Amino acid sequence: VSAVEQSAFGPFFTVEAHAADETPTPPWRSVSGLVDGSPSLGGRISAVRSSLAARMAKTAAEVDLRVAASVTHLGLIARILAPTIAAATRGVRISQAPDDLWWQDRLGGPFPLSVLKTESGQREGECSAVPGAAVESITRCVVGETGVSDRVLWGNVGSAANSAAQLIAASRPALTGAARDIADTYLRDPRVDGGVLRAGPDFRRRSCCLIYQLAEDRTAVCGDCVLETRTGATG
């Protein structure tokens, strides 16, 4: 999938590409830095926590660390899975090895992401690395860093996969089936709500990403949340 085709699905799908023999230079950094025990992940969570606090006119200490951790995790995972799923619908596999993914640590929207240049012809659904090393490693490290429930975080993985499929379907209806099939390779993972959910407009996760706690309003939940009701959702 070309960069132009990817970007047509939305900003979360836009990627740059680098060769295997290239080394990231600032502001680029390897995703491996988020999962190697360095301060990068904790720093990202702290920055998100401060940003959320500023938006809610609170202090950082007033934002539950678990909420900031879940928001951080969902943002990272959604950014990685969106282009991965889009590429896979066209038969292209994007490596999810942390060393093969570069990112720029920015807030305020989808951060820049660069992926390893790959050859066409291998579908992500045919690859054994599903959900993928980056997804698994980031999820494990967020749990270790903050103690947030792994059920919440794997629910985030499901939400990210389904959201990517829905955005692709909305932009390119002809790819609806392919996008949902690829998303389902993630949703079948037993860590994602038992592996029984499937992609589509009726997707409803069995956990909450905790974002509603920022508004202190139980009705301010995402449309795919276990807490969502038809009369009380905000999207």
Sequence positions of predicted segments:
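Generic N-terminal leader/targeting and pre-domain segments
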Residues: 1-67
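Intrinsically disordered, low-complexity segments enriched in small/polar residues
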Residues: 8, 192-193, 233
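Generic structural motif recognizing short loop/turn segments at the entrances and edges of beta-strands
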Residues: 8-11, 27, 97-99, 109-111, ...
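Intrinsically disordered, low-complexity regions enriched in small/polar residues
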Residues: 11-15, 30, 105, 113, ...
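General structural signal for secondary-structure boundaries
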Residues: 27-30, 145-149, 171, 228-231
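Hydrophobic, aromatic-lined core segments that form the binding pocket/scaffold
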Residues: 38-201
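Nucleic-acid modification enzymes, centered on SAM-dependent nucleic-acid methyltransferases
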Residues: 82, 86, 93-95, 217-220, ...
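Local cysteine-cluster metal-coordination motifs and their immediate loop/turn environment
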Residues: 205-230
